[in-house]
Amino acid sequence: FPTVQILITGIGRDNARRLTIETLNESDAKAVLTCGFAGGLNPALPRGTVLFAGDDNFPHIEYLKKAGAKPGSFHCTDRVLITKEEKEAAHEAVGADAVEMESGTIQQLCDEASVPCATVRVISDAADETLPLDFNQLLSTDNTISHAALAKALINSPERIPDLIRFRSKITECAERLSAVLTDALIQNIQSSP
């Protein structure tokens, strides 16, 4: 059976770079999946859509397709795109289907190490949706969510709490959708192994 190692890099390129370098140096990775949430840029793709983009030599693309992931393109940025206007402008500028913050760095490191890599992301907020808070304002210097900044934002704007609770519910559904696709793809891989 294939060995699967899960690495949680956190938010942003710096965290992704540091932990991916460590992991690639300490393991004999045969392939890498960079997974997580993405903001929608393509207005035709609803929240909950699982997209993938991979190297031509990535060995598990067919499993992802059979599991329900759709081919797509990603734009990697240094910040969370909050408003539908920001997402529309990014879509017009780069034409990508979704936006996220880590896969470009992980892909580059895998290319340098000659390790096949694919990005698999679920759209957590569609192109026409504005996020309930500016999550960029909540990030600490190490790109983790600052609980103090979150508390301050909610104290200053308590009317956003219901929207944030609804967003949490939507995010949970998206995480479950991504998990189902990845689990199905892994099971297919195991079943096809000699």
Regions inferred by a protein language model and the residue ranges of each:
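Glycine-rich phosphate- or other oxyanion-binding loops that anchor nucleotides, phosphorylated ligands
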Residues: 1-194
